[in-house]
A protein has these predicted regions:
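Bacterial N-terminal signal peptides that target proteins for export
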Residues: 1-8
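C-terminal motif of bacterial Sec signal peptides marking the signal peptidase cleavage site
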Residues: 17-18
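An acidic, Gly/Ser/Thr/Pro-rich helix-cap/linker signature
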Residues: 22-130, 136-139
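Short, functionally critical alpha-helical segments immediately adjacent to catalytic or ligand/cofactor-binding
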Residues: 59, 68-80, 145-160, 192-195, ...
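Secretory-pathway/luminal and periplasmic proteins that interact with or process carbohydrate-rich
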Residues: 78-85, 157-166, 178-182, 198-204, ...
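Substrate-binding clefts and substrate-entry loops adjacent to catalytic sites
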Residues: 113-126, 174, 179-186, 200, ...
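Flexible, glycine-rich surface segments
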Residues: 203, 207-314
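C-terminal soluble interaction/assembly domains
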Residues: 269-367
Length: 367
């Protein structure tokens, strides 16, 4: 009778929520699946539940307990997540390799105008005074300047206001099943299961973006497992509702991947003479001293007091020339801190926006 009751409950829930695209596992037997196994059945929605079981089998191999895996039912196929992922991919225009690239001299400027508004700087100033205690604690503990923690918090989740309302397991399983980036999203699905298995959060609270990024930090599950930190000593790593933990996690991430709190991110420069585009980039062998760059005509764009202070700090370290819009747009000399921001998000546009946002926060607040 108990098995019939469980089955009836599952069927009723399926009817309410939309049937075939909902995983309703009640069996305790989840066979292990090799890490390298490839799903061979057609990627049609009627196979989605079977694919979820396939991923759970891989999670068994990764050490996730059967009890945790069996408790995670109602994993749904989210069509909107697939649509958003494909739309994002569609914004990257494929060009004919036999044709020269189309250059956009305003790419960096357009991006900054969109994401780094005066209103965002105003909000950052207001929020700074509200979160000063947890922000300073994270800054001091992990040796990361406050303005960079605040800038990442503001950019990633709009100061904690936008965290996403998607069920993370469903989003990750959906995007893995879609196949465009299966290796990434299947790995993140298993890492999300590990989070649940280690009691970091309850499933009902594990909400995030359509791509599975979570909390005020917008960490993917792998980033959570590697960098999430307990900022207030309560034993939890709550990046969703606890600012002590959110700021500690941001700072721990940067610190772990090589942040130096004695350095700024970089400065904007002007090129007073032609310079080969091949010299730009963040590869280690492209680093030069400030003196070497200046000898090649790379000069500060601004001579404000803030930029001069940054220039002094940058005069004792390796620097890289960054030209996000290739040979036609703006240029920047950046420190290794810029490279650590790229570890967070590999977009040069994003990294420049974080650096400039941090500069404006520092200037506005007087840090």
């Amino acid at each position: 009778m108990k098995k019939i009751s469980l089955l009836s409950t599952a069927l009723l829930s399926c009817l309410i929520m939309g049937c075939s695209s909902v995983s309703q596992t009640v069996s305790a037997n989840i066979p292990a699946v090799s890490r390298d196994a490839v799903y061979s059945k057609p990627r049609t929605q009627n196979n989605f539940n079977d694919y979820v079981q396939f991923l759970k089998g891989k999670a068994v191999t990764e050490g996730v307990s059967p009890a945790t895996l069996n408790a995670q039912n109602n994993i749904r196929y989210i069509e909107k997540a697939v649509a958003l992922d494909r739309a994002q991919a569609g914004r990257t225009v494929k060009r004919d390799p036999n044709q020269p690239p189309v250059l956009n001299p305003n790419g960096t400027t357009n991006y900054l105008n969109k994401v780094l508004t005066n209103n965002k700087v105003n909000v950052a100033e207001e929020r700074y005074w509200e979160v000063q205690v947890p922000l300073q604690r994270a800054s001091q503990r992990y040796c990361v300047q406050q303005e960079y923690i605040l800038a990442l918090w503001g950019m990633e989740s709009s100061f904690g206001h936008y965290q996403g309302r998607y069920d993370v397991l469903s989003a990750l399983a959906t995007l893995a099943f879609d196949g465009r980036r299966e290796a990434l999203f299947s790995k993140e699905f298993i890492n999300a299961m590990k989070m649940l298995d280690r009691d970091h959060i309850q499933r009902a609270r594990m909400l995030g973006s359509w791509a599975g990024a979570m909390g005020q930090t917008q960490f993917m599950p792998s980033a959570f497992l590697n960098y999430a930190a307990d900022g207030n000593g309560d034993g939890a790593k709550d990046i969703w509702t606890n600012q002590f933990d959110a700021f500690a996690s941001i700072a721990n991430y940067l610190h772990t991947v090589g942040w130096d709190d004695k350095l700024p991110w970089g400065i904007e420069v002007t090129l007073t003479q032609p310079i080969d585009l091949s010299l730009s980039g963040i590869e280690k062998n492209k680093a030069r001293s400030l003196r070497d760059w200046q000898a090649q005509g790379v000069m500060p764009l601004s001579f404000s007091a803030q930029e001069q202070a940054k220039l002094t700090a940058l005069s004792h370290t390796d620097l890289w020339l960054i030209r996000p819009d290739k040979q036609v747009g703006r240029a920047f000399l950046v420190s290794n801190n810029f490279r650590t921001i790229l570890d967070w998000n590999k977009s040069n546009y994003f990294a420049v926006s974080i650096g400039m946002f941090a500069d404006r926060i520092k200037e506005r607040i007087g840090l």
